[in-house]
Design a protein with these regions (language model features):
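N-terminal edge beta-strand
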Residues: 1-24, 114
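Extended interaction regions within the primary functional domain
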Residues: 4, 50, 81, 106-110
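Extracytoplasmic beta-sandwich strand-turn segments characteristic of Greek-key/jelly-roll folds
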Residues: 11, 54-75
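Extracellular/luminal immunoglobulin-like beta-sandwich modules
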Residues: 39, 45-46, 86-109
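Solvent-exposed loop/turn motifs of extracellular immunoglobulin-like beta-sandwich domains
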Residues: 18-27, 33-35, 67-71, 77-89, ...
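N-terminal V-set
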Residues: 1-7, 31-63
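Conserved strand-loop elements at the edges of beta-sheets that form or border functional pockets
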Residues: 10, 18-20, 32, 42, ...
Length: 114
């Protein structure tokens, strides 16, 4: 039955705005995961960042956190301007299920140097 398939809450792109130097948390809600893997992909270069708890990027700032309510959250520590852009979480079903998060990075006003 379809009920045991993993599914994502909300197919629309989420938007997250984070200040430079702070931590970003990109949400991907997955329910009834079973034995399916959840991957986070950085769309600008197609780099697979995480699969479940495993991290596949040398950058120590990236971490996937599984929340008690079955959210898989991608944490990016000390966000930099180049982190801005689209990220996608994918569930390893056939066909795969995916949801996108758009990360916007802003500079806090008191850090401006004129």
């Amino acid at each position: 039955s379809r009920l045991v398939e993993p599914y994502l809450d909300g197919y629309a792109t989420s938007n997250v705005t984070t200040q430079i130097g702070t931590h970003a948390y990109l949400p991907c809600r997955v329910k009834q995961l079973g034995n399916k893997s959840v991957s986070w992909i950085r769309l600008r270069d197609g780099h697979i960042l995480t699969v479940d708890r495993a991290v596949f990027i040398a950058d120590q700032r990236f971490l996937a956190i599984k929340q008690p309510d079955k959210y898989w959250t991608l944490q990016i520590k000390y966000v930099q301007a180049r982190d801005a852009g689209s990220y996608e979480c994918q569930v390893s079903t056939e066909p795969k299920v995916s949801a996108r998060v758009q990360l916007q990075v802003v500079v806090p006003h008191h850090h401006h140097h004129h």
